[in-house]
Amino acid sequence: MLVRSDPFRDLDRFTQQLSGTAARPAAMPMDAWRDGEQFVVEFDLPGIDEQSLDLDIERNVVTVRAERPDVDPSREMLATERARGVFSRQLVLGDNLDTEHIDACYDAGVLRLRIPVAEKAKPRKIAVNRGDRQQTAISA
């Protein structure tokens, strides 16, 4: 059996996923890294009104929602390439993060979350008793 293949179909599908379409908006791009005793996550949200941002946390899942409203229908649009509608992204956080003290800041189209490392996840010393009852500290 022969299957006809278009070599550009996969490339076209990949491009649509990156740029998004009206029916399926592009994903909220993000970067995440550890900076000392905290994790930092940045989401690119250009053109999003700060009032439309919504952050929720339930257990260890952070949900970020934002909305870019539709274009005024009275406009005669010549091009409509920017994704519109509601955007949503969820992050599952590990138990080693302190979800009670998340700091969120939105500036210049970038939403930045700073999530501190939980105290229970930080290195600490544990005392070890010897047979003669002397204590020696080791790193854990």
Swiss-Prot record:
General function of this protein: Not known. This protein is one of the major immune reactive proteins in mycobacteria.
Record family assignment: Belongs to the small heat shock protein (HSP20) family.
Limits of the sHSP domain: 21-131
Protein name: 18 kDa antigen 2
Domain of life: Bacteria
Parts of the chain that traverse the membrane: none
Natural source organism: Mycobacterium intracellulare
PROSITE patterns for this protein: SHSP
Alphabetized Pfam families for the sequence: HSP20 (PF00011)
